Amino acid sequence: MYNTYAIIVHVSKLRNSHLFANASAIPNLQAVIRKKLLDSMKSRQKDVASTLKVFLSEIEYANKSSKPVTTDLDVLRVLKKNIKKRKQAIEQFRKAERLDLAEKEESQIQTLRQFLPEHASNI
């Protein structure tokens, strides 16, 4: 029915991709976000998957800076920074009367807020 070789090659490419490499060497929160990304891709939630892909790429970018992301606190730092940036974008979109883009940013913030601890979710 399925070409077994093609499936093995596909799975090995997934393991070697930058999103899923070194799963044991990453913080727990980052692993949870990657799991959520996989789930959203499987259930075809394009908006959620897109938001999480962008966030994971920002973590990768932060890893290449002077402050690499090595703990959950570092992931939270990047997450809070990302949410703050999106809030500023919402303000700019509302000033420009682009309510459609503001709503899109708000939904992306809601996607990211689910990874904040309860006491920090009011950010």
From Swiss-Prot:
GO molecular function, one term: carbon-nitrogen ligase activity, with glutamine as amido-N-donor
Signal peptide span: none
GO terms (BP aspect): mitochondrial tRNA modification
SUPFAM superfamilies with a match to the protein in the record: GatB/YqeY motif
InterPro entries reported in the protein's UniProt record: Asn/Gln_tRNA_amidoTrase-B-like (IPR003789), YqeY/Aim41 (IPR019004), YqeY/Aim41_N (IPR042184)
Entry's Gene Ontology cellular component terms: mitochondrial matrix
Domain of life of the native organism: Eukaryota
This protein's name: Uncharacterized protein C22F3.15
Species this chain originates from: Schizosaccharomyces pombe (strain 972 / ATCC 24843) (Fission yeast)
